From Swiss-Prot:
Name of this protein: Sugar fermentation stimulation protein A
Segments of the chain annotated as binding DNA: 201-220
GO molecular function: DNA binding
Pfam families in the cross-refs: SfsA, SfsA_N
Mutant lacking the gene: phenotype: No visible phenotype.
Protein family membership: Belongs to the SfsA family.
BP GO annotations: positive regulation of biosynthetic process
PANTHER family for the chain: SUGAR FERMENTATION STIMULATION PROTEIN A
Keywords attached to this entry: DNA-binding
Record-linked Gene3D superfamilies: 2.40.50.580, 3.40.1350.60
Keyword DNA-binding assigned: yes
């Protein structure tokens, strides 16, 4: 996936009110960007980091500029726009870049499922194969090349794991897919130190037949694509 039109560069001054960030452009202009990430963004929003942003042609938007990527002061690229996790995963499935999810003839998005009536990110179907339910999570929290999810306690994420376990119990295929959107991450684990319950449920889910996949994106200011499978340690 290529960014079109190209992203523009600025330097982060501060992120605040969760959805806003002030930056300064190379020519000295101060802008306020929309921040499409409600998480803690630990390590992704340090003042002085390089920010790459897009600009909408919708003149009615109060904040037409959107923060897409962070380029940290150590050089790592991080996709902070959480919407890209699903877009990149869909693209990779359709391109059959994810070997574990290849060979299906139909892909549906936002399908209602489960006892708690959640919406699954993707459902894959093919003749003579069980349906495949895929829940996608964006991973940007990193420490010493170790990627973690979540970056804050997530009751919603816990619910999704319970739903996937119920799907697996019914004989369907259930997959939790971690889209790693941080160029410095080389391996993945649940963030037990942040959300112990989520880590416990993820281990239980694996024992009950839920598949756990982690794929890392190649990220630059020009574009992104999910390419590489990463090891997962529970």
């Amino acid at each position: 996936m290529e960014f079109s039109p190209p992203l523009q560069r600025a330097t982060l001054i501060q992120r605040y009110k969760r959805f806003l960030a002030d930056v300064i452009t190379p020519d000295g202009r101060e802008l306020t960007l929309h921040c499409p990430n409600t998480g803690a963004m630990t390590g992704c929003a340090t003042p002085g980091d390089t920010v790459w942003y897009s600009t909408s042609d919708n003149t009615k938007r109060k904040y037409p500029h959107t923060w897409e990527l962070t380029q940290s002061q150590s050089g790592a690229f991080i996709c902070v726009n959480t919407l890209w996790a699903n877009r990149l995963t869909k693209e990779a499935i359709l391109n059959e870049s994810i070997s574990e999810l290849s060979g299906y003839s139909s892909l549906k998005s936002e399908v209602k499922y489960g006892a708690e009536r959640s919406r699954i990110d993707f459902m894959l179907q093919a003749d003579s194969r069980p349906d495949c339910y895929i829940e996608v999570k964006s991973v940007t929290l990193a420490e010493n090349e170790q990627g973690y999810f979540p970056d804050a306690v997530t009751e919603r994420g816990q619910k999704h794991l319970r739903e996937l376990m119920s799907v697996a119990a019914e004989g369907q295929r259930a997959v939790i897919f971690f889209a790693v959107l941080h160029s410095a991450i080389t391996r993945f684990s649940p963030a037990r130190h942040i959300d112990e319950k989520y880590a416990q449920l993820l281990s239980e889910a694996q024992q009950r037949g839920v598949e756990i996949l982690a794929y890392k994106a190649e990220i630059s200011a020009e574009g992104m694509a999910l390419k590489k499978s990463l090891p997962v340690t529970l």
